[in-house]
């Protein structure tokens, strides 16, 4: 295919898309009904497109059903076809990416090398391993009775003496008492090797197949390796860690590679002797290359007492360069043409001897790392980004381990603790959607699990997985059978402590119930008409109100019983030499003394003046009472009273079918008697309050509201009875 063909194909595809879009915007059915020829052409084109779609689908799957064009399901049909085409295009892109990767690997002059596949007959992931902690000379202490003490016995390459570096720092607002990082001053003030600042030719790694790793598990082999490391300028280091059968975790294996050799160090067997490697690890003239040393630095100082000065972290280098991914597997594949496998990343590295695939996997982590370091260093120097990577590497090297009990109150990247949250069980509540009212039960189970894990040096998830803890909170079994038969994943620790856990759950539920009852508010007696409470008060609030009320009552009683102040005493007689007097001011503004006797005289004069006052009688006008004239009740003679008994019809009378409605005249009223209608003045409008022109306005007619409570609709128009046609007839029966 020439370079011009893709452009021609693209232009044709664009024209097809434009034509289809313009056709879709028209009323095709309307034109089909108008023109028979257009309808035939359109149907033939649609059938041709359906045949092409069926050919494409049948070429992928011979058993796939063919598409049939039907107007009722054409949208679903083409949606399915579009999904199939999307999958085909994605597969094409994936194949093109593979082809480009193959071309790039060939252009580099070497094929991609793979980690060997092994049968794994001598590796059993389910095999029970004896806990190596039982053989340690220094027993594991998980009590956290004191801050973490560095395991340094001596301090090589020191700028500050060991005694000064291991002084306990007093607690402050954010940090409890702790021991500082013993090599923090050296990491900040010692310079890197001058060779790391220069662009140098890349040194290729030794052949993978021609070299064999050296296993180090004795003191003699350790000292021999140490002498070899002292004569190097760069070393690559990595660790394998296990944290499932240990509370804090243990370092199981250390991989160290030089330009010539690969070492695999048994850190379980040489745990007490590896501190001598500080002579190399703290030497700033030897570059220590790690990848992602974020946790490796913590594990080295916690288990082995090792610290790193002169760290180069390839993880931060890959980020500074701007690589799409920053994993070690990506660096191995793109910079060393080596395809590793993460199959054994989470394997149990405590087993001895190591299987062949585990040995190969551990060796691959550091075998190519120095060559990758050469390539990344040159790229960083060319882009002027090396200083930033060294700064980040220093910060990683200054990280220190601290027990959870003595962690800083404010989380910091410089300090690592196994538990960094104040209430870690709340994370489980969020993950498993546990209601807040069961937080007490979650906390009790979490603390019990943590206590057992510390005692037996097991991980909390080994004692009781999070799923099992959430199930206990959800189902709350309160007997042994309920705890044991809760799920299939009941651990040995839970099975052995089933009775204790059942009692713990029962007590926690009782505490939750009591807490809820105490926190339930007592409603007041004041309620609205619809039953809604106006106010709610709790028991402590009632007690507070009662105490305040009693204080007020006592204070009022004491005030009422208080005697007035006098100028004499029962025992000593009259104390004050002068009489009591008040002060009055004259018109001139000068004060004059007013004695008590004067006040008494004034009071007597006031009383006598009140007695001489005449009583004034106010007459209240009574409303005018109009006498009501009652009509005289006339007695009627029973003889002259009309008879209302039904009369018997006479058969000889005439029956009139229609009769004129002639109203009888009312008898004239007696002269001299005038009858007036009563007037209701409350309904008469006030003339003075009316606005001008208001009476001229027409009143609005009352409209019928169908949604009102009054269900009576407007009355229909009154119909007139049709007049009888013909003559009026009368006949005899």
From Swiss-Prot:
Its EC number is 3.1.13.-. SUPFAM superfamilies: HRDC-like (SSF47819), Ribonuclease H-like (SSF53098). The keyword Protease does not apply. Residues 687-697 have a biased composition (Polar residues). Present with 2160 molecules/cell in log phase SD medium. Belongs to the exosome component 10/RRP6 family. This is Exosome complex exonuclease RRP6. It comes from Saccharomyces cerevisiae (strain ATCC 204508 / S288c) (Baker's yeast). The lineage of its organism: Eukaryota, Fungi, Dikarya, Ascomycota, Saccharomycotina.
């Amino acid at each position: 295919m020439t370079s011009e063909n893709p452009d021609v194909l693209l232009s044709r595809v664009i024209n097809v898309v434009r034509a289809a879009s313009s056709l879709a915007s028209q009323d095709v059915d309307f034109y089909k009904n108008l023109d028979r020829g257009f309808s035939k052409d359109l149907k033939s084109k649609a059938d041709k497109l359906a045949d092409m779609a069926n050919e494409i689908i049948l070429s992928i799957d011979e058993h796939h059903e063919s598409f049939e064009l039907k107007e009722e399901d054409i949208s679903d049909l083409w949606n399915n076809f579009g999904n199939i085409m999307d999958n085909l295009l994605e597969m094409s892109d994936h194949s093109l990416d593979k082809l480009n990767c193959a071309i790039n690997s060939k252009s580099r002059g070497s094929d991609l090398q793979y980690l060997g596949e092994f049968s794994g007959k001598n590796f059993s992931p389910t095999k029970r391993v004896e806990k190596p902690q039982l053989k340690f000379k220094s027993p594991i202490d998980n009590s956290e009775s004191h801050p973490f003490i560095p395991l340094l016995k001596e301090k090589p390459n020191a700028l500050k003496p060991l005694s000064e570096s291991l002084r306990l720092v007093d607690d402050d607002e954010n940090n409890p008492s702790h021991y500082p990082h013993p090599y923090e001053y050296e990491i900040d003030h010692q310079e890197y090797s001058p060779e790391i600042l220069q662009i140098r030719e890349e040194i290729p790694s030794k052949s993978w197949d021609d070299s064999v790793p050296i296993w180090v598990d004795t003191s003699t082999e350790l000292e021999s390796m140490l002498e070899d490391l002292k004569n190097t300028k760069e070393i690559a280091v990595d660790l394998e860690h296990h944290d499932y059968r240990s509370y804090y975790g243990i370092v199981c294996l250390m991989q160290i590679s030089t330009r010539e050799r690969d070492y695999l160090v048994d850190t379980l067997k040489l745990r007490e002797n590896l501190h001598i490697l500080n002579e190399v690890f703290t030497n700033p003239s030897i570059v220590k290359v790690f990848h992602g040393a974020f946790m490796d630095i913590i594990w080295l100082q916690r288990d082995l007492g090792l610290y790193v000065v002169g760290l180069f972290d390839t993880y931060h280098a890959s980020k500074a360069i701007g690589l799409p991914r920053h994993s070690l597997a990506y660096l191995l594949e793109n910079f060393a043409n080596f395809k590793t496998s993460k199959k054994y990343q989470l394997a149990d590295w405590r087993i001895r001897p190591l299987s062949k695939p585990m040995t190969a996997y551990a060796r691959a982590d550091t075998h190519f790392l120095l060559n990758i370091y050469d390539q990344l260093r040159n790229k960083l120097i060319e882009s002027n980004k090396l200083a930033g990577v060294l700064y980040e590497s220093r910060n990683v090297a200054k990280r220190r381990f601290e027990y959870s009990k003595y962690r800083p109150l404010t989380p910091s990247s410089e300090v690592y603790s196994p538990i960094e949250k104040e209430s870690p069980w709340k994370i489980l509540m969020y993950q498993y959607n546990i209601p807040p009212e069961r937080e007490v039960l979650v906390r009790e189970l979490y603390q019990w699990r943590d206590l057992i894990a510390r005692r037996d040096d097991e991980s909390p998830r080994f004692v009781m997985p999070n799923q099992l803890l959430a199930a206990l909170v959800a189902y709350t079994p309160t007997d042994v059978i309920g705890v044991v038969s809760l799920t299939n994943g009941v651990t040995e620790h839970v099975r052995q402590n089933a009775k204790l856990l059942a009692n713990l759950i029962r007590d926690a539920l009782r505490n939750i119930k009591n807490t809820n009852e105490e926190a339930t508010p007592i409603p007041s007696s004041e309620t609205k008409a619809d039953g809604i409470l106006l106010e709610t008060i709790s028991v402590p609030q009632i007690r507070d109100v009662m105490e305040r009320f009693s204080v007020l009552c006592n204070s009022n009683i004491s005030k009422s019983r208080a005697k007035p102040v006098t100028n004499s005493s029962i025992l000593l007689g009259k104390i004050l030499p002068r009489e009591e007097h008040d002060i009055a001011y004259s018109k001139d503004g000068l004060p004059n003394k007013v004695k008590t006797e004067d006040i008494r005289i004034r009071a007597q004069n006031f009383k006598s003046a009140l007695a001489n006052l005449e009583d004034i009688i106010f007459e209240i006008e009574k409303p005018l009472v109009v006498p009501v004239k009652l009509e005289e009740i006339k007695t009627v003679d029973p003889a002259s009273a009309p008879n209302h008994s039904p009369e018997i019809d006479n058969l000889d009378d005439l029956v009139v079918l229609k009769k004129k409605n002639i109203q009888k005249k009312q008898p004239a009223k007696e002269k001299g008697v005038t009858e007036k209608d009563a007037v209701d003045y409350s309904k008469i409008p006030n003339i003075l309050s009316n606005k001008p022109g208001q009476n001229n306005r027409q009143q609005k007619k009352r409209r019928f509201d169908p949604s009102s409570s009054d269900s009576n609709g407007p009355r229909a128009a009154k119909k007139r009875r049709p007049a009888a046609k013909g003559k009026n007839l009368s006949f005899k029966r």
